Design a protein with these regions (language model features):
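Subset of outer-membrane beta-barrel
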Residues: 1-262
C-alpha cells in the first residue's frame, strides 16, 4: 500500500492529511465499507468515513475521519484454554486534522486522534491464572505530515513531482488490564515520492515509491539477558517491555531488531 506522496484525494486523511491543502474543490466527504477476508469469514468488517473543508490558502483546511473495525465473533478462553463466552471485539478511531500551505508547493498538517479498542467486548471475566480482568483500552495520538507538489510543464501538459512524509500514531500506550501491561500502538513513519506523467487531456501515468518504518520496539526473545548477564524470566521480559516509554520506543525501534549491528 502507498499513498503518502500520491495525488490528493478524499481519502488523504489516512495517508497524508497535508495533501488536502492541494485539493481543488472547496470540500468533500467519502465513505468506504470493506468486508474483510470474505473467503474465510463473513463477519469481519472495516468502515471508513472521511471529509474535509478548505477555508482558503491563508486560513487552511480542516479534515476529519472515523474508522471502525469489527473482528466478528471470537470465542474467549481462560488461562486453561477452556471456552467460557463469545465476544465481538471491535476497534474504532476518530481524528481531526488541520493543514495549511507553507509555500506554493509545500503544505503541512497536524492531526489529533482518539483510539478505542475493546478486545473482549465488555466481558470482564478472569482470563489469567492471577484473575486479571480485561477492559477496553483507549489512548490519544497525533500525526505530523508534510507534502510537496510541484508542476512541471511539458509539451503534452503539466506533469507533477511530489514528496510526502507522515509520522502517524505518535501517542501513549494502551492497557487492557488494570495498567500492569502497557501495549504500544502502531506508530509509523512514511516517506514517499511520486511523479505523474501526462499523455493527453484524459490519460496520465504515475510512478510512486514509498518506504514505511514501524516505530515500535522489538519484544526481546526469552533468551534475552539483563545487565548482569542473567537470563530474564517471562515476567521480567513483560515488565521490561511495559516500562519502555513511547518516545524511547520510537527511537529504540531503529536499532533493537534481531541481527542489528551497532
Amino acid at each position: 500500500d502507498l499513498g503518502v506522496a500520491t495525488n490528493p484525494d478524499l481519502n488523504s486523511q489516512h495517508w497524508n492529511p497535508a495533501k488536502y491543502s492541494f485539493m481543488e474543490s472547496k470540500g468533500g466527504i467519502t465513505a468506504n465499507y470493506t468486508p474483510w477476508l470474505t473467503k474465510l469469514v463473513t463477519d469481519i468488517d472495516l468502515a471508513y468515513l472521511a471529509g474535509y473543508y478548505n477555508m482558503g490558502d491563508m486560513a487552511g483546511t480542516i479534515s476529519g475521519s472515523f474508522s471502525y473495525f469489527s473482528m466478528g465473533a471470537v470465542q474467549l478462553v481462560d488461562y486453561t484454554g477452556t471456552a467460557f463466552q463469545e465476544a465481538h471485539p471491535n476497534e474504532w478511531a476518530i481524528d481531526l486534522a488541520y493543514s495549511r500551505k507553507l509555500h506554493e508547493y509545500v503544505s503541512m498538517a497536524v492531526a489529533l486522534r482518539f483510539l478505542y479498542s475493546d478486545l473482549n467486548n465488555g466481558v470482564n471475566s478472569s482470563v489469567t491464572e492471577n484473575s486479571t480482568e480485561m477492559h477496553p483500552a483507549w489512548t490519544m495520538a497525533a500525526d505530523v505530515a508534510l507534502y510537496y507538489r510541484q508542476p512541471i510543464s511539458l509539451p503534452m501538459g503539466d506533469s507533477y513531482f511530489a514528496l510526502g512524509f507522515n509520522l502517524s500514531n505518535l501517542g501513549g500506550k494502551m492497557a487492557y488490564d488494570d495498567g500492569d501491561t502497557q501495549n504500544f500502538i502502531p506508530a509509523n513513519m512514511r516517506l514517499g515520492v511520486s511523479y505523474e506523467l501526462p499523455f493527453d487531456d484524459y490519460n496520465r501515468l504515475m510512478f510512486s515509491v514509498e518506504a514505511n518504518k514501524m516505530l515500535v520496539p522489538t519484544y526481546q526473545s526469552k533468551y534475552a539477558l539483563n545487565e548482569d548477564g542473567e537470563a530474564l524470566t517471562g515476567q521480567q521480559l513483560k515488565e521490561w517491555y511495559s516500562s519502555i516509554s513511547s518516545p524511547k520506543g520510537w527511537i529504540q525501534s531503529f536499532h533493537d531488531a534481531p541481527g542489528y549491528v551497532d
